[in-house]
Regions:
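Short hydrophobic/aromatic patch on the recognition helix
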Residues: 46-47, 51, 96-97, 101
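…primarily DNA-binding HTH/wHTH and HhH modules…
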Residues: 98-117
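The short coil/loop that forms the "turn" connecting the two helices of the helix-turn-helix
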Residues: 42, 91-92, 107
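An amphipathic alpha-helical interaction segment
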Residues: 1-7, 11-14, 42-48
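Short, structured helix-loop boundary elements
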Residues: 9, 13-16, 33, 37
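Terminal helix-turn-helix DNA-binding modules in bacterial transcription factors
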Residues: 17-25, 30-34, 53-93, 114-117
Length: 117
């Protein structure tokens, strides 16, 4: 491994850390790809390629998985209504949320809450 590749790898790690920190701070908001790309001063197309090459997933998939993990936490630790939880964690389309939730957890939010309590 050359010194240049080590430097590039470290720079990419720092850039990923910055965009992940941004995502964790703003995931409740409607984050556009251009917003995330701007944190690294990149064009959205370059950002998408950079993120996928360095994480193995698209930025949108990462963002939605992060949001789903937060919804999961609230489902099993609070009695809040589902619509409140979704709103709190940045989901605005219930139909899309249900599809993603079922794909990820193979159940509905209500059933999961019942099973884990």
């Amino acid at each position: 491994m050359t010194e240049g590749s080590i430097f590039r790898r470290e720079k990419n790690r720092q850039r990923l850390s910055a965009v992940i920190a941004y995502t964790e701070a703003h995931y409740r908001e409607n984050i556009a790809l251009s917003d995330a790309a701007a944190t690294l001063h990149m064009h959205p197309n370059s950002f998408c390629r950079f993120f996928k090459e360095n994480t193995g997933v698209t930025y949108l998939n990462y963002l939605n998985e992060y949001r789903l993990s937060k919804v999961y936490e609230d489902l099993v630790t609070t009695d809040a209504a589902l619509h409140e939880i979704l709103e709190k964690h940045g989901f605005t389309n219930y139909k899309l949320f249900r599809h993603m939730f079922a794909e990820r957890f193979h159940t509905t939010p209500g059933r999961m809450r019942e099973e884990l309590r």
